């Protein structure tokens, strides 16, 4: 059989099947066709991956690839890290598209739009109607939903709850850098975010950023965060991989 691509002699890791080892990988019509210890046949293109890892493309659910955050190098950096699909976690969506046209590397890239007083909403206490209008607008423009930038541009507690609820009603994705006018980006802000979600879907960004020991010892804050997540399956999250992070 002739494949489109045959990758030979690499150390392959398949997270879905928990299989890893030295395997050949065959690709046909853009899909993995076979993973075997040795694959015969020919291919339009053959790569020797000796001494290299062969990994599935990474899905990064929190990146920045706009002119506001991330900049023109974002696409190249993601591709070099092995990312194939990503969610830009603030927008503006129009800027993400512009950079993709100019500097794109073939990523599957989705966006959500920031909720920022004086820019996308009128104040730090937008009404439900204003939030619904924003969400509908960005959905029509192609974004999946909204990002609450509580750690940088916090809304009032009530407006934060309204935003999460409005997004849920409109079927929009909501991500939240925890923090409101009442609580900062710490364990208190995290627990407040869980409460404000009120059972609605919510992506709580970089969970470990709120467990740095600013209120309680780090271990206690981490335990509180883990318990809160376990008790609220409506909330998803990711974490920083580096000990030095924003």
Task: Identify the role of each PLM range.
Residues 73-153:
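Divalent-metal coordination cores built from histidine and acidic residues
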Residues 10, 30, 51, 62, ...:
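Divalent metal-coordination and catalytic microenvironments
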Residues 14, 62, 90-91, 150, ...:
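Residues that line or immediately flank small-molecule/substrate-binding pockets and catalytic motifs
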Residues 128-145, 154-246:
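Histidine/acidic residue-rich metal-binding segments in metalloenzymes
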Residues 1-41:
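N-terminal metal-binding scaffold of metallo-dependent hydrolase/deaminase domains
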Residues 58-68, 150, 174-181:
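Histidine-centered catalytic micro-motifs
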Residues 55, 99-112, 164-176:
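Alpha-helix-loop-beta-strand connector modules within alpha/beta enzyme cores
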């Amino acid at each position: 059989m002739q494949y489109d691509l045959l990758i030979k002699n690499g150390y392959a890791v398949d997270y879905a099947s928990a299989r890893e080892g030295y395997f050949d990988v065959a690709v046909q019509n853009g899909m993995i066709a076979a993973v075997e210890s040795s694959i015969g046949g020919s291919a339009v293109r053959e790569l020797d991956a000796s001494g290299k890892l062969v990994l599935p493309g990474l899905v990064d659910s929190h990146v920045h690839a706009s002119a506001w955050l991330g900049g023109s190098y974002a696409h190249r950096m993601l591709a070099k890290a092995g990312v194939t699909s990503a969610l830009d976690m603030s927008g503006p969506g129009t800027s993400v598209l512009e950079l993709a046209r100019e500097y794109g590397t073939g990523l599957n890239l989705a966006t959500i739009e920031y909720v920022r007083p004086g820019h996308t909403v009128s104040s730090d206490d937008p009404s439900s109607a204003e939030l619904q209008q924003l969400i509908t607008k960005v959905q029509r423009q192609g974004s999946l939903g909204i990002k609450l930038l509580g750690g940088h541009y916090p809304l009032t507690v009530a407006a934060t709850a309204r935003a999460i609820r409005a997004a849920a009603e409109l079927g929009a994705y909501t991500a939240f850098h925890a923090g409101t006018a009442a609580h900062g980006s710490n364990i208190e802000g995290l627990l407040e975010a869980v409460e404000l979600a009120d059972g609605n879907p919510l992506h709580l960004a970089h969970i470990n950023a709120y467990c740095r020991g600013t209120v309680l010892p780090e271990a206690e804050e981490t335990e509180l965060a883990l318990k809160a997540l376990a008790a609220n399956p409506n909330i998803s999250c990711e974490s920083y991989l580096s000990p030095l992070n924003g």
